Each structure stands twice: as structure tokens, then as C-alpha cells.
Amino acid sequence: MDNEAILRKYKRRQILIDVLPFIALAALFAVLCITVQSKGYRLDMYLKIVFNEGVVLAVVATGAVFIYTLGSFDISLGASTLFSATLGVMTYNATNSLALMILVIFAVAVGCSLLSSVLASVFHIPVFVTTVAMMSVLSAIAAQIITTNGGALGGISIPSALVKPLDNMGFKIAVLAVFWLICFFIFDFTKIGRRQKFLGGNPVCAQLTGIQVNKYAIIAFVMAGVGVGLGAFLTLIYTPSVTATTAGSIGMNILVAIVFGGMPISGGPRSRIYSALVGGFSYILLNNILKLLIDSNVGYGVSQIVSAIFFLAVVYVTGLNYRSQMLPR
């Protein structure tokens, strides 16, 4: 086979892999609609659930793309979301100030991400160790605050009337769209995104060209922190209360969602900012479909198994694009 034929085959495979996440999203949406209607449930109710869960996951995952592009990961983002929301609620209950609550949420979210980046980048502690430690510490502190102030079951809350004007599709779409467009611009049209892709693809070569690894790692974690802050605020808008289990699964769901969106698990030049958006809603759709199809008594375990199978299949398919003798184009 000549070089031109190899190149054509490579490009066809690349195009197919790029469009697969969108096809999967449309297919999952159709399956959800058919399943809900066949069981006689209200479609508008399920679509609202999918939308509210998907927006939070997509927002946090969009910020996390910057970390995953470096070939790194952060499984403490769910705990950071819980911790930020907890301190935000405590701030409002102490001051009755919505503006101060929002400020605290974002300050805590970015601060937690900065702490993770400093431990990983400056002190050279492995990212896995850092994020696991942060996840455990933040979850424990948040749980202690919630238990002390509101009880283990009841949790802590803010008045629902405070955020009810914001609990609508238009506001949430606007938040997601603005944040995604900002991240899209930074990721695809500035040197920050280009250099982070370079670092994820070949860190040794990137360092030899003079790119500062620590600088761009810190920027990545800051962007993830902003996403966590938005996710915590949107969570409080949808459910104006916080319990010890709030946002508990977001950390791992982000990893699955980004891969579902077609982004390689190793990051690098094939990273795409739309992966968080497409993958986030795809994962939520799949999760709700499985809840509808599987008996509730065993649903959670089976759902996790099916999600894991989907995850491995997507990783395998996206990995096909890199098993060639050609450099990424």
C-alpha cells in the first residue's frame, strides 16, 4: 500500500472517530425518549433531570479538560465541588449575602485546585497521590461541617427562594455556553492551549523547547477550579441543600465523560474541548437509560458494569487512531 492510500485510510478513520461521539449522543437521546415513552413516564420530567445533571457534569468536565490534556488527571474534583458548596452555604447562612456566597464558592474552588497543582508541580508529588489525598481530606472536612451544622441526613441548606429565579434552562445554558466558549478560545486559539497539548503529547520535547511545565500545569488546575466553582453554584441552584454525598461521583464521572466525548485518555494534541460537553451529556443519558431499564434493586451495580464496558470500548476505539506509523496531523 502506497503512502497516499495509507494517508487516505488514516484520514477516514480520523473523521469517523471524530464524529462517533456526536452520533452516540444522538443515539442515546433517541433511546432515552423511546424508553421513557414506552414505560409511560413523563418525558419532560426525565429531560429536565438529564439537563440539570448534564450541565453540572459538562461545566466541571470542561475545566478539567485542561488537566487531562497534560496527560494528568484529578479525581478530587467531586470533593472540591462538595467542599466549595458547603462553605458557600455556610457563608450565606452567616451573612445572608448571595454575592459573598458566590465569591467564597469560587475562591475555595480555585484555592483547592491551586493547592493540588502546587503539591503536584512544585513539590513533585505524584498527581495520583495528591488528588487522592485532597479527595479524602476535602470530603472529610465537608462531611464534618455538614454533620455538625445540619445533621448527617438533613444536611445544610439555603432558602430555595434565593436561587429559584436562577433555576431555569436559559440561565444554565448561558452559564455553560459562556464558560465553554471562553475555554474553547483559550484552548484552541491561544498559546496556553497549544502548549498544553504539546506538553501532553511529548513533555520531554516540550521542556527542551523552553515551555515551563509548572506554569501551564497551574493554569490547567486554575481553569479546573473555575469549572468546579460554577458546578458547585449550579448544584445549589438545582438543589439548594448540601449533604455529605453531594457531587460524590463527579470525580470519576468526569474521566468517563471526557473519554465518552472522544478525547484520548492520554491527552496531547488530539484533545478536544467539546469532549466534555458531548461526553458529559452522553454519560448522563446512558446512566438514566440504565436506571430505567434495570431493576432498582440491582440497578446501581449493573449500571456501573455496563458503564465500565462502554468506557473500555470507547478507549479501544479512540486508541485505534494512534496505532499507526504516522505522526498526528
State where each predicted segment sits.
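Alpha-helical transmembrane segments within multi-pass membrane transporters and channels
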Residues: T95-S136, V178, V278-G279
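Cytosolic-side transmembrane-helix boundaries in multi-pass membrane proteins
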Residues: M1-V31, L181, G201-K215, L286-R329
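Single transmembrane alpha-helix segments in multi-pass membrane proteins
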Residues: A27-I34, D44-A94, A120-H124, I258-R270, ...
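Hydrophobic alpha-helical segments embedded in the membrane of multi-pass proteins
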Residues: E53-G63, A79-F83, V110-L114, L181, ...
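Transmembrane alpha-helical segments in multi-pass inner-membrane proteins
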Residues: V242-I305
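Transmembrane helix-bundle core of multi-pass membrane transporters
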Residues: F123, V127-F189, I218, T239-A244, ...
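Helix-loop-helix "hairpin" substructures at the membrane interface of multi-pass membrane proteins
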Residues: S97, M101-I102, C112, S116, ...
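Inter-helical junctions in multi-pass inner-membrane proteins, predominant
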Residues: S38-I49, F187, G227-I258, R270
